[in-house]
């Protein structure tokens, strides 16, 4: 089945200050899309996107306190919402995008709470379209939802080299039946149940960058996606890189997945190749191609997507995006 998809939207980011140590920030992104070749009839439909057009809508609160000697205490709570209906996203959580407290120092950051895993940080600069409605998340829904509840994280950057790790005692306490709610709270007597861990090695410079990350989640009784036992694992290996030439960025990456819960085709490779071109200070054009293939199976998927973004100001932009799968 082939589909053509398009969306036109307006995104508004609204940072504001509560004081020297506290900030309220946010972004509202509303998109209307037209989808062709839907269902057995092959008809089309028009709808308003609920999760994202180009960037997911959110409102967040960030506070910090200087403790001296380069050490600061930080707290972040960030809520995701669907502006078309005014409902919470991330499985209905009140602060589902991020919710953590920690410390920041010259040696890096250490935090506890609901946070991004290292898979998210590994692809942030190489996956050109990112959380766009037509992007890597269309083929692997975990990628834009790479977060873990009950997580302990460390991340530090030293002369362009970033290292990081996460460990979650119970990766997902919500039973929404979506990638953001897979009913695996963990923290029981089984030491492996619903655990998550990830590790990151990343280098960035003005001319180029590369990243390597591993992300592994374990199952538990009642967990969704057939990960119903702590003996079952879902692992992803992310390798990518990018180069910058004048106003152009080119990027290539791979996410290899080994999913114990899939008896038919446990291994899959998701390749992506993208380009971002800053045509003018106010106009950016980006495009990306994706190829998902399963080992030992004829199942394949190819996605092509492009986007043009025009900035009306530092905080407001219009964009149009097109996808074909």
What name fits each language-model region?
Residues 32-40, 81-87, 118-122, 171-175, ...:
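Gram-negative outer-membrane beta-barrel proteins
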Residues 28-34, 75-79, 114, 165-169, ...:
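Transmembrane beta-barrel strands of outer-membrane/channel proteins
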């Amino acid at each position: 089945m082939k589909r053509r998809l398009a969306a036109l939207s307006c995104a508004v980011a609204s940072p504001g200050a509560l004081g020297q140590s506290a900030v309220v920030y946010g972004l509202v992104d509303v998109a209307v899309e037209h989808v062709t070749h839907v269902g057995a009839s092959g008809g089309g439909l028009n709808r308003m996107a609920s999760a994202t057009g180009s960037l997911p809508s959110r409102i967040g609160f960030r506070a910090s306190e200087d403790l001296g000697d380069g050490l600061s205490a930080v707290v972040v709570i960030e809520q995701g919402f669907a502006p078309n209906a005014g409902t919470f996203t991330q499985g209905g959580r009140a602060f589902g995008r991020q919710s953590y407290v920690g410390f920041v120092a010259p040696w890096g950051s250490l935090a506890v709470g609901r946070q991004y895993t290292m898979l998210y940080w590994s692809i942030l600069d190489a996956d050109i379209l990112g959380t766009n409605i037509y992007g890597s998340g269309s083929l692997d829904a975990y990628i834009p939802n790479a977060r873990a509840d009950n997580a302990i994280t460390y991340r530090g950057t030293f002369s362009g080299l970033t290292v990081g790790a996460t460990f979650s005692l119970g990766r997902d306490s919500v039973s929404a039946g979506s990638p953001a709610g897979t009913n695996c709270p963990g923290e029981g007597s089984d030491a492996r149940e619903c655990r998550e861990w990830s590790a990151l090695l990343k280098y960035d410079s003005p001319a180029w960058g590369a990243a390597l990350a591993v992300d592994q989640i374990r199952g538990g009784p009642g967990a969704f996606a057939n990960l119903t036992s702590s003996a079952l694992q879902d692992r992803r290996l992310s390798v990518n890189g990018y180069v910058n030439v004048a106003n152009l960025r080119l990027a290539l990456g791979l996410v290899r997945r080994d999913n114990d819960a899939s008896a038919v085709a446990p291994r899959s490779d998701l390749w992506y190749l993208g380009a971002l071109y800053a045509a003018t200070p106010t106009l950016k054009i980006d495009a990306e191609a994706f190829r998902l293939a399963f080992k030992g199976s004829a199942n394949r998927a190819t996605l092509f997507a492009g986007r043009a973004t025009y900035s009306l100001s530092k905080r407001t932009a219009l964009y149009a995006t097109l996808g074909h799968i």
